[in-house]
């Protein structure tokens, strides 16, 4: 009877010793998995940034070589067109000079983006921006229509055929930002002329997974 009781106690002690050890093991495995995921995400981010830097340099070089008069953000490669060159006040109809500018710029831009980096470019975004005059909803509608007007021309027959046009048509989207991203001076005052603009930018994804 005593022997049986001792065996029972020993089994309970073994179980009580087992669970803390098992829990520690699970915690260790979980920590390793978390560290691996963090490391992998960091590596992916680094690779994507490297690709983006290469694209930025290529785009800047292309614009310089072809004397295309647009602004480019040195940090992220965003290309900016001022409102005055593209639209009349309160209008979303593209000016003829805007069409001529896009007819020169877009073929060069598409070739630069897709020739060496096409498999990693997941999206081309055309954004319309306004100043803070008027209601947010009015500006949202205007900025969206302006972005769509640019996209519609870029993929239209009117602009003509150019290399990678089909690929660009698959990837391009139009977004209206309203007055959400106005440009401000050092004192924090809104620069309305600069805020009214259209931007063309790209997104990089080395996994090449398109957003739904």
Regions found by a protein language model. Name each.
Residues 75-77, 81-83, 90, 120-122, ...:
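Envelope-exposed proteins and targeting segments
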Residues 47-70:
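N-proximal, solvent-exposed amphipathic alpha-helical segments enriched in charged/polar residues
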Residues 51, 90-101, 118, 134, ...:
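Extracytoplasmic/periplasmic, Sec-exported soluble proteins
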Residues 59-63, 72, 87, 91-125, ...:
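Periplasmic peptidoglycan-binding/anchoring modules of Gram-negative envelope and division proteins
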Residues 1-55:
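Short terminal targeting/anchoring segments
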Residues 127-207:
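Periplasmic OmpA-like peptidoglycan-binding domain that tethers envelope proteins to the cell wall
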Residues 52-54, 102-107, 148-151:
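Well-ordered, non-membrane alpha-helical segments in soluble/globular domains
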Residues 74, 81-85, 128-130, 204:
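Short, small-residue-rich loop/turn micro-motifs
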